[in-house]
């Protein structure tokens, strides 16, 4: 067999080997003095431990500790040691899933007693005790039947094996020849590299993320090859906690949830509603300037509508159960595409009518498993900045450029930094995955590449990632917590116009199907507000801040309160969100305005009244400034107008 080894310097070495060989043996064949930093390898792109056997032609790449996959394999090894520790301390516990998540690891297990944070400390101490000696983490691979027999006393393991192993071998990890855990990842072969770790929390987690299943206990932790880097990670986690939009949302009274209303259904409080409303006003104005026509469509749609669009067949699991009344079945809409198609179809269209740009700030409902719900990031009710543009094929290039320019302008104003751009294209060799029209695909993809070059944009081509119905362009950002998300999207759809028989009359009096451009501006308001909260740590720019000015009278004299009220009314007349905070000592009130991150606080006392001016302090600054009211209003109005 022929094995191509991609060296760390990028060069390729080819070996012709007769018999099966492990990654470790191959590494030793390359160099007798094995680099101890190499801990795994990829076999045709799949991560494997060093003792995995190579049996046929393959492309191999060795993985070092500081590689991204190196962190993954270390984390999974930590999860195995944690599973072993739990079984030693609580023999009746049933280990379900040990896995990794971003730069951390976790273990889900079933145990009759709820473990406390005090017990978490004892578990960590026991792990450290176990790790004094080098523990073997041995991979054991069996047939499905053998694996089911081996794990017969663990119903969770049995279910996992049945769900994830249709054919072929199923591997488990045997830790210290005592604890056997069904594998859901790849672990290091022994514990020698596991020196620096920290258990973070013990929480509840539903089996397989489904709230209809049993609730298990989950222990989460982090680890690293370096003590210094582990400390850095812990500091970073603390910073992430302080930036978590769920924490900030509660502290700043932005939003709340209540299970009596329904899981995953966000409730915007007055402060949150101000942010949402101001964002909407800004985006509506931008869309107006870019020639969009706003529409409003029902939050319900008939099942027949979604059957015709194809969503019923391909998206049904993410839709709520239909409401059956009389002879009709209605469903809460998960998207507006079919509704906007009905608007297009409501009139006869000429080629001169296109592009037709429809926008809607649309309330949508999508079913998410309760275990996946995460604050405002993953919800069941959301409002989307949605648009569908109906264009002729020859207009695609120009319309794409307009869409991107609008997106770029909005993201710049909102201080959102683009991480990278991706262009999802079809795989021409896969004739079943994509709508079958080679000419249309080739022309569309060529046009998109040309316009991206004209805009001088760097992008990542993603072959095989296009939707069934057309190519897709995504704007990716990295949140303050390090998550990569798609913030904006431009997607071309050749298929939906055909499904709904949408046409326009061309210059030769022929009926032609338009192309639909799906344009997402900032995604949903819910997720975008979560992103903003975490990015700015709850400190909004003046124009977006829910509470812009706090007036703090030093005393309760009649003339002081009269002056404060006069300031209040004048600021409100200038559309500045202003309030008087008069209860409590002046010190406590100053602390409150800082805690609530109000951009400006005005102090009013006898001196300010006598001189007919005011003393203000900006959030985050220690020094106060004395100005006239007109100077103050001019300063703030300029900031609001310029969105700074």
Map each language-model feature to its residues.
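NTP/phosphate- and nucleic-acid-binding module
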Residues: 1-77, 81-96, 102-644
